[in-house]
Amino acid sequence: RLREIILKRAWSEKRKALTSTFDGHELDASMLLVEPLGFLEADDPRFRMTVEAIGKDLKRGDFLFRYVVADDFGRPETAFTICTFWYIDALVALGRGEEGRALFETMLARGNKHGLLSEDIAMATGELWGNYPQTYSLVGLINSAIKLSVSWEVAS
């Protein structure tokens, strides 16, 4: 029952995507997690449309905002690093692995000389911002690397 309510009230026909709030129209990159959390299957058209809407609305160059609406700190100015990894994972789930891999390689290049990433990345410069090193960002990198990797069966 709860799933039905969420799908009815969080889906925006206007945006053709799952939104950040019930009966709302604003996008949030956290909706990229509906597939890995098992809420929607990768072949569900609502997942594909949500990924496409988020890519169109929240992606700037190689990075993603989590959302673009003002919060307690104002309008976001930097990309939330883990969101780009969530997007990479969504691309892989949709069968767009080459696109995901290219973006993953770009993100790898953003790490410092030790391969560490920060919480945020400045959109214009690629400079690391925010909490550093950021566990969320590094876990996102690891998860994406696993999703992009060839299985042991295929590799052997």
Where in the sequence are the language-model features?
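Functionally critical, mid-to-C-terminal surface segments that flank or help form catalytic/ligand
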Residues: I82-W86
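Extended glycan-interaction surfaces of carbohydrate-active proteins
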Residues: R1-T81, A102-A155
